[in-house]
């Protein structure tokens, strides 16, 4: 293999790993869909743009989505309801008494804040760009806005129809997401996004699909897991340098216990992340504690700690994979919904806070719950680390787990009583010949 072939091979491997990382086994069909539903197409066109979060557990938090695209020609946004462009652009070439809303070749559109006047709203708008996950609240997992566009040229679509030329280079302005090109699909109805005074049918629909990759969002993880149990005094901490090393040049600023972070001078000034100094340097830690074993049940305590000193996590969620979740009997202080159910398989569930109680995890704070699970006689055991989760995700990010060989062991390093009994019988059988020889 020559040098050129080797370089090509390495490039293909890296490219393949990047696309493989975009696949999510917990939510394989999760994505964000952007629809452009055209209500009229004449000299100008009126279109309802809707953003649908079809992800089971990933949500879009503040500062929210920032939808962008590149026009095919010299399009002009004359008016917009339910959102606004961040820049008006150069509109000097436009003559007339009416000023356009935006003349940018590549506009960036943001949602309006809550409390926007009624006459500048459409349904599902004005939440500051925040989108809930489907599991937490499917009613707030969609955003929409309406705009009037002129100066467009017509083009022929793949099905032979003619209409406005398709834009390109779509983005949602949220780290980790990449978007496809727009395609013409079967017309959908946009009536549910309109206020009663402005209902209209949909003539043509464009659609864009955006997918998430944790590899694209961050170079390092953002959460880690620690473990403990009632049967072992050892507390297994998050692996060292899980999200970065304390004294690394690329590590965010950290402060010791009792110190206060420096706040920005102005309200609009961006706040750099400031963490509490730890060996793992993760902004979030999830601690799983096996608390009590009853005759037919066992109890687990989960604590989520926010080490970020300048950020609150609103509408947070936690996804856990464990085979005994199918037998979850009682849960305290959190909401819960199974995510993966195939026949008898039900090993992945999502936890999130209760509204007005703990749906927001405050900076340098924590939230916690306890759950009671029924022991399944077919596979329940405390040996081999079975009682600890297989995977943990916080706010859509997979957390770093400790190595399995560091999990808390049963007393004397032994397995559970059933295995110990088997070992005792086997040992006795091996000793029998020696006993007979002695006799």
UniProtKB/Swiss-Prot annotation:
It is found in: Cell membrane. It comes from the Eukaryota. Residues 1-22 form the signal peptide. It is a lipid-anchor; GPI-anchor. The keyword Lyase does not apply. Residues 413-439 form a propeptide. A lipid is attached at residue 412 (GPI-anchor amidated asparagine). InterPro entries: COB_C (IPR056900), COBRA_pln (IPR006918). Glycans are attached at residues 138, 181, 186, 232, 312, 346. GO terms for cellular component: plasma membrane; side of membrane. Its main location: membrane. Keywords: Cell membrane, Glycoprotein, GPI-anchor, Lipoprotein, Membrane, Signal. GO terms for biological process: cellulose microfibril organization; plant-type cell wall cellulose biosynthetic process. Involved in determining the orientation of cell expansion, probably by playing an important role in cellulose deposition. May act by recruiting cellulose synthesizing complexes to discrete positions on the cell surface. Belongs to the COBRA family. This is COBRA-like protein 7. It comes from Oryza sativa subsp. japonica. The gene is BC1LP1.
């Amino acid at each position: 293999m020559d040098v050129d072939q080797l370089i090509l091979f390495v490039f293909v491997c890296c490219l393949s790993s990047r696309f493989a990382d975009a696949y999510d086994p917990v939510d394989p069909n999760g994505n964000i869909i952007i629809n452009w539903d055209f209500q009229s197409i004449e000299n100008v066109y009126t279109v309802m743009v809707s953003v649908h979060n079809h992800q089971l557990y990933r949500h879009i938090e503040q500062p929210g989505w920032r939808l962008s695209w590149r026009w095919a020609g010299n399009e002009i946004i004359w008016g917009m309801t339910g959102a606004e462009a961040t820049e008006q652009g150069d509109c000097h070439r436009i003559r007339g008494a009416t000023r356009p809303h935006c003349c940018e070749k590549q506009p960036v559109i943001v949602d309006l804040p809550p409390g926007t006047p009624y006459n500048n709203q459409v349904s599902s708008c004005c939440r500051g760009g925040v989108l809930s996950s489907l599991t937490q609240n499917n009613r707030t997992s969609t955003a929409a806005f309406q705009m009037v566009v002129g100066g467009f040229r017509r083009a022929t679509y793949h099905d032979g129809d003619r209409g406005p030329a398709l834009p390109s280079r779509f983005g949602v302005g949220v780290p980790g997401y990449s978007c496809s090109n727009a395609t013409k699909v079967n017309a959908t109805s946009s009536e549910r996004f309109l206020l009663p005074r402005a209902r209209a049918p949909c003539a043509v629909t464009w659609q864009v699909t955006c997918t998430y990759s944790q590899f694209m969002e961050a170079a390092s993880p953002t959460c880690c897991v620690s473990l403990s149990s009632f049967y072992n005094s050892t507390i297994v901490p998050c692996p060292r340098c899980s999200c970065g090393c304390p004294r690394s040049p690329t590590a965010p600023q950290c402060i010791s216990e009792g110190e206060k972070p420096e706040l920005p001078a102005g309200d609009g000034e961006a706040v750099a992340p400031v963490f509490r100094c730890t060996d793992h340097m993760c902004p979030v830690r999830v601690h799983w504690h096996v608390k009590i074993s009853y005759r037919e049940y066992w109890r687990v305590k989960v604590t989520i700690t926010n080490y970020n000193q300048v950020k609150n996590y609103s509408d947070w969620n936690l996804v856990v994979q464990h085979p005994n979740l199918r037998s979850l009997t009682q849960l305290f202080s959190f909401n819960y919904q199974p995510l993966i159910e195939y026949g008898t398989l039900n090993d992945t569930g999502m936890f999130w806070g209760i509204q007005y109680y703990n749906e927001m995890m405050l900076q340098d704070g924590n939230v916690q719950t306890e759950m009671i699970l029924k022991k399944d006689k077919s596979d329940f055991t405390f040996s081999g680390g079975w009682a600890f989760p297989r995977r943990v995700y916080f706010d859509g990010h997979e957390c770093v787990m400790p190595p399995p060989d560091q999990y808390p062991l049963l007393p004397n390093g032994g397995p559970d009583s059933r295995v110990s009994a088997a070992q005792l019988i086997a040992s006795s059988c091996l000793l029998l010949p020696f006993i007979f020889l002695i006799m």
